[in-house]
Amino acid sequence: MSSFDGHRHALTDRLDLRAVAEADVAALHRLTSDPVHSDHIPGGLQETPESTRAWIERFRGRWDITGLSYWTVRLRATGEVIGIGGAERRPGFWNLFYLLDSGFWGNGYATELARAAQRGAESIDPDLPLVAWIHEDNAPSQGVARRLGLTDYGLLGAAHWNGEPMHYWADREPGARLRSV
């Protein structure tokens, strides 16, 4: 196993963060197939439980390779699954991602999750920038990025998601590798 197993389970004040697992497919499919999230899911909505399973399998595999990936997000008080997110290592940067059930928006959970991901990424490889790719009209996600101390460096290269340009939010200026993304 990875020497970073300690990151597979993290607790915040209100959240229980556990590495995504096969047992989470049904709960995460409810989230990733909900049309209200269509603009916020990499690759778009997950049409079937099988597509959700394949999507989270990719994240599961990254835990052993890089020591950090995405967690299933649960409320500590109830154990209810309310989202997915974390930091995934990509070539030259940590990709910050957070997606919460819309019924839990506006309560600070995304910021709490993102801070845990930020701490994890910094503890594993602080030399890599932490990056969030955010639609220019996604004000709530921009607010989370600001609370983490990230800066909006604007549109960068050819970065697109679902055909729309994404803003590069990061904890430092983009290097040459990211300018070409």
Language-model features: locations:
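Acyl-donor (CoA/ACP) binding surface of acyl/acetyltransferases
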Residues: 1-40, 57, 70-181
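Active-site rim helix/loop that mediates acceptor-substrate recognition in acyltransferases
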Residues: 45-67, 76
